Amino acid sequence: MPVIIWINGGFGAGKTTLAEELHRRLPDAVVYDPEDVGLMLWKWIRPNGDFQHLPSWRELVVATALSLRKHHAETLIVPMSLIRDAYRAEILDGLADADEEVLHVFLEADAGVLRERLNARVTHPGREWDQAAREFGMTGLDEMVAAAARQPGGTLLLRSDRLTPAELADEVLARVGLRQVHADDKRMRQARSLERAQPARSSAPSPSWPPTSPGP
């Protein structure tokens, strides 16, 4: 099942929870969090408030995904918000241009639900990082809710405020299985086309070598 499952959605939509549930069912998959790429960049350059604005982040996110797929895992699970349309298109198109199968999932939830989840979230107890992360998430809450209507065709839209993590995972894996059938059919059609394009082999016997000398 070679595929990249990109889990998009607003902060508090349940991306990490769904990624964990999918990984539980697909233990050979790799969970790849592009946030780590941003934190790595911030070790070398001055933090800019949102690493998604960095062209290097967007380029490295694609390059890292391709390398992980090539060397380490057939299936990647990527929980990462891509709310800005241009950034989403740049990254997903970059993966598609490399002939990667990508299932783009967008988790929807009402603004009130997202707000409650963000207020209840504690990642680093007692640290200012948690408060800063909550404030960052709250700032773009309306934009994150509105983004659901702007997702490209082929996106799997799921309501994370109405479905359990297990039900969400069921929907994702059902779509992955369907895509895999289509991918297998496509490969079979391509193989048949190549066979038809090959020149037909002659049925005439091959001449012997060395040639037989003529008799007396």
Question: Each predicted region: which residue ranges?
Answer:
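Glycine-rich phosphate-binding loop used to anchor ATP phosphates in small-molecule kinases
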Residues: H53-F106
